[in-house]
């Protein structure tokens, strides 16, 4: 199975979700000066920012990470967290990234996610990678 790459703000909601998920994952640094580069296909897990608009929905650190052509080329899908209080903008970062990078938006969960979200993502990620060509 390939990896997960995620970003978590200082609230650590996404970090706690990843810990509960228990799958291999690499964190995009909170410090904008630090960079990472991935070397295998991955699914991105990202929180949504802002009050509901498209502008500002994707964290700057994630934009910087995806602006690296090498990292962007290995992206295979996106999972987004958000807050249902934002209505239609709930999980908007997933929609933005999926459209701009032409990858599927696989799932969204609220804040730290529920146990059901954990189980759905574990199962969905496993099934997603099983459907992918070996050299994808």
UniProtKB/Swiss-Prot annotation:
<comment type="function">
    <text>Probably involved in ribonucleotide reductase function.</text>
</comment>
<dbReference type="InterPro" id="IPR004465">
    <property type="entry name" value="RNR_NrdI"/>
</dbReference>
<dbReference type="InterPro" id="IPR020852">
    <property type="entry name" value="RNR_Ib_NrdI_bac"/>
</dbReference>
<dbReference type="Pfam" id="PF07972">
    <property type="entry name" value="Flavodoxin_NdrI"/>
</dbReference>
<dbReference type="GO" id="GO:0010181">
    <property type="term" value="F:FMN binding"/>
</dbReference>
<protein>
    <recommendedName>
        <fullName>Protein NrdI</fullName>
    </recommendedName>
</protein>
<comment type="similarity">
    <text>Belongs to the NrdI family.</text>
</comment>
<dbReference type="InterPro" id="IPR029039">
    <property type="entry name" value="Flavoprotein-like_sf"/>
</dbReference>
<dbReference type="GO" id="GO:0036211">
    <property type="term" value="P:protein modification process"/>
</dbReference>
